[in-house]
Regions:
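N-terminal low-complexity or amphipathic/hydrophobic leaders
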Residues: 6-74
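Extracellular/luminal Protease-associated
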Residues: 78-120
Length: 122
């Protein structure tokens, strides 16, 4: 959380997502959210942090074998290792659950690294 002051993070925790989206919209940022994302569990604290983004595209089964995941430069692996402490990993899977945006091993790795949370639509 080097870029955003802790005081700013605390202030944002008190503001609704709808209010923030409206403010961004008024500033000309019209595509600043992923649609239909819901919390896994209601009643948990608001997740606030800088966004570290990753976008998946549909994979070709004939080209995207398990071997690609062994590559240390695979974008999913890079994102898990580079997402900064305190940040939120935001994954755009284009609403395709087959994209397998993150499993328990990757989520655990992010937790150990101090990432504040994950938002995904896939």
């Amino acid at each position: 959380m080097d870029h955003t002051a802790a005081s700013t993070i605390e202030k944002l925790k008190k503001v609704s997502t709808a209010t923030i989206a409206t403010c961004l919209f008024k500033k000309g940022l019209k595509k600043q959210f992923i649609q239909d994302v819901k919390p896994l569990k209601l009643g948990k604290p608001t997740m606030v942090g800088e966004a570290y983004t990753l976008r998946y595209i549909p994979a070709r089964e004939d080209l995207n074998t398990i071997e690609v995941f062994k590559n240390p430069k695979h974008l999913q692996r890079v994102a898990v290792e580079e997402c900064p402490k305190g940040a939120i990993l935001v994954i755009d899977s284009r609403k395709d659950a087959r994209a397998a945006s993150a499993g328990s091993i990757l989520v655990t790795r992010l937790m150990v690294r101090g990432v504040s949370g994950i938002v995904t639509d896939g």
